[in-house]
Amino acid sequence: MTKSANTKRCIKIVVSVTLRLCYHAMENSLAIIGAGRVGRALGRRLRELAWKIGCVVTRREASARRAVRFIGAGKPCAGMTRQILASSVILIATPDDEIPGVAQQLARIGAEELRGKVVLHTSGALDSRVLDTAREHGAAVGSMHPLQSFSGVTVPSLEGKVFAVEGDARAVRVARQITRALGGSPVRITGGKKVLYHAAAAMAAGHVLAVEEAATQLLVSLGMRRSEAVRALLPLTRQVLENFERLGPRAAWTGPLSRGDYKVVKAHLEALRDSPEEFAEAYDALNGLAARVLAQGVAGMLAELKNVSVQRKPKTKVMGSNA
């Protein structure tokens, strides 16, 4: 190989590496709109991973400054500003009903500068169509939802957590890169079905919590201290979930309904007459759901449950959450 050829080859390598570094630096710059629990937590984790944090946008500068302090980097911005466009990735972490308006404002202030940007939102229920205004101006749009609860006090570990991603190809690619960098596992969801994914998450989190609290209140109504009731129920719940993971749903299913003991099921419903009506209604509905998703003879079990359902009289008693 001649000296000239070597020189050309070296120049190509240098140019290639330089372009990669520039591309990497550009891809790893992030603006955050909406600095609530999710926005702050993701911002902090990404800052720890050497992402360059640009604008952190909230309605008021004081809250933006607090968010920047929590994240450890960024420029506090009160309201939408063109400085957002200095970052290559724009993360919208506002409440769901504000996301379409944010996209419209981005289009208004960005216009042609949106071309080539990646705009992601973190809603669990909404898909990327709410960002169509930004898409029309050349941005690649998508959504990235971590299947994780955020307390706002500490930053949870995202290691092994599932992130639902969807949207344009480039936006999905960036969402996957972010997810993997955070230690998460990206799962692509069909945009039009995303709300069903969110319903599943709500059942597994919020509804399980409601059932656990209802059971706790029932034990408290019998004279247990709340701490005793929680201590009694949590190991039971944990064991069921561990069995669900290890053995599968049917093998983990316990209780009178799993054994076809309808007399006990009816006795439970009778005992719940003195509780607020939602308790017996939920117990009844959950029996039906268990029959539908766990029983082998679904029709027969549903028929038996219909026979033992208790017709309730209206009640006014209220069981407080701090009973």
Model-assigned labels for residue ranges:
Residues 71-154:
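Rossmann-like NAD(P)(H) cofactor-binding subdomain of soluble oxidoreductases
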Residues 65-70, 134, 138-139, 155-246:
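Internal alpha-helical scaffold of NAD(P)-dependent oxidoreductase catalytic cores
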Residues 55-58, 119-122, 163-166:
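Short, hydrophobic beta-strand segments that form beta-sheet elements in well-ordered domains
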Residues 240-300, 308:
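Interdomain hinge/lid region at the active-site interface
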Residues 23-82:
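NAD(P)+-binding Rossmann beta1-loop-alpha1 motif at the extreme N-terminus of oxidoreductases
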Residues 5, 14-17, 25, 318, ...:
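Acidic, Ala/Val/Gly-enriched low-complexity intrinsically disordered segments
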